[in-house]
Regions:
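Cleavable N-terminal signal peptides of Sec/SRP-targeted secreted and luminal proteins
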Residues: 2-18
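Structural motif
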Residues: 104-106, 156, 176-179, 244, ...
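Acidic/His- and Gly-rich active-site-bordering loop/insert found
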Residues: 2-3, 19-125, 143-152, 336
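Short beta-strand micro-motifs in enzyme catalytic cores
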Residues: 90-94, 196-198, 263
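Short beta-strand segments
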Residues: 109-111, 158-160, 179-182, 201-203, ...
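Acidic/histidine-rich catalytic neighborhood of metal-dependent amide-processing enzymes
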Residues: 124, 128-197, 237-238
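Metal-dependent amide/peptide-bond hydrolase catalytic core
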Residues: 19-32, 38-39, 183, 190, ...
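Acidic-glycine-rich active-site phosphate/pyrophosphate-binding loop
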Residues: 103, 113-117, 175, 190-201
Length: 374
């Protein structure tokens, strides 16, 4: 390796390390970003830092929305803040485009809320503020290189406060393509699994634990059903792999010396086939054969979602998480790409390498350009 090349690669390795290391602490310090300032996309790290520093747990995304609104308006975009119902009443989807027409060939979109788990919640470094920062930097870099028309019509940016499904009426993709940003480890998604939510409930008869005979233990009934459910063989497919099941919530009982009268659980199935009804039938059979007293309900389902990946030069991947892609209707191509890994998103280990963020800017630029020149 030539000395210059060596120095450059050492520098870039230390940039990557810097953010990853800093991000392990609960707040990213200013010096993390200073140590890691890249030359290629001047706005990238500053923007990412600003986005990550503004909290935006789902249902209260007001501040980060206003920041983006100002940021984009200052750069000459026409910005429309679409109010979103729910949450603390101060949340907006930010829709931005160049020129006077909001009808564009490409819509580039991601979400700005950071998901709240039951115990841990990520700061959104990866999911999905990495995508938002890289998408904006990509559009800005294309503008600088005259890859998109300054007078508009090519690209619109949409940052959703919570869910794209709220946008279907106002921004359905009439253009050629919508590019979605979620963590895909820098790969182009060929599709993602579907979802089936399962609610289970058992009713019993309360009583004193010392005298079990007249009572009926709802927890015992439920647990027998759950144990059988976990052994059920769910349909798989070549493209999407195994259908998997997670029992994520279990509730019931009041005290260890009282026979519980109620117990319930909920599970989420990640569907690898669109045979939703078959999967429901398998689950019902497994639960009811082992424990007839358990009631099952299936409040929500969505089959696996195939996604376009007809752009050369990308590794591709099937993702096991859901997105709102099926909710954005329209006759357009759909691409899904983003920096970072879902394995660290939503946790206090959430972090992103600067090199991945920079690669994402390049890749979003490529995707946008390829669609525009078709
Ligand atoms: C797009 O522009 C049209 C015409 O000006 C307008 O009716 C519509 O509300 C706009 N939509 C958004 C999301 O800005
Ligand atoms: C899918 O399930 C089969 C059978 O249970 C298992 O052997 C295999 O390792 C699973 N594949 C993946 C990718 O988890
Ligand atoms: C699945 O079951 C529902 C409810 O029973 C029914 O309305 C629907 O048509 C079924 N879908 C298929 C593909 O069989």
């Amino acid at each position: 390796m030539k000395p210059l090349g060596l120095i450059l690669s050492l520098l870039s390795a230390s940039f990557s390390l810097a953010i990853a290391r800093c991000a392990r602490h609960s707040t990213i310090t200013r010096s993390c970003y200073e140590k890691a300032t890249p030359q290629q996309f001047p706005e990238l790290l500053e923007l990412h830092k600003s986005l990550v520093e503004i909290p935006s747990v789902s249902d209260s995304e007001g501040a980060v929305g206003r920041f983006l609104q100002d940021y984009l308006a200052q750069r000459g975009y026409t910005v429309y803040a679409q109010p979103v119902e729910g949450g603390d009443g101060d949340r907006h989807n930010i829709f931005a485009y160049l020129g006077g027409s909001n009808r564009t060939q490409v819509l580039v979109t991601s979400h700005i809320d950071t998901r709240r788990g039951t115990e841990l919640w990520g700061r959104g470094t990866v999911d999905a503020k990495g995508s938002v920062a890289a998408q904006i930097a990509a559009v800005e870099s294309l503008r600088r290189g005259h890859g998109i028309a300054e007078e508009g019509g090519d690209v619109a940016l949409l940052t959703a406060a919570a869910a794209w499904r709220r946008l279907t009426t106002s921004v359905s993709g009439d253009g050629r393509a919508v590019i979605f940003g979620e963590p895909t480890e820098g790969k182009l998604a060929r599709g993602h699994k579907g979802i089936l939510s399962v609610s289970l409930a058992a009713a019993g008869k309360a009583g004193h634990s010392g005298y079990p005979e007249p009572g009926a233990n709802a927890i015992d009934t439920l647990v027998r059903g759950l144990a059988s459910l976990q052994l059920a063989e769910l349909p798989r497919s070549e493209e999407f792999g195994n259908t998997t099941l997670n029992v994520g919530v279990i509730q019931g009982g009041v005290a260890d010396n009282v026979i519980p009268a109620q117990a319930s659980a909920s599970a989420l199935v990640r569907l690898a086939t669109d045979r939703v009804n078959d999967t429901i039938a398998i689950i019902e059979r497994a639960v009811h054969e082992a424990s007839p007293g358990v009631q099952t309900e299936f409040p929500y389902s969505q089959g696996p979602v195939p996604i376009d990946y007809d752009v050369e030069g990308f590794e591709t991947v099937i993702l096991n998480y859901g997105t709102d892609i099926p909710n954005l209707k329209g006759n357009h191509k759909r691409y899904l790409y983003g920096p970072g890994s879902i394995h660290v998103a939503h946790s206090d280990q959430e972090h992103l390498d600067v090199s991945d963020l920079e690669a994402a800017v390049q890749d979003y630029s490529t995707l946008i350009s390829k669609v525009l020149t078709r």
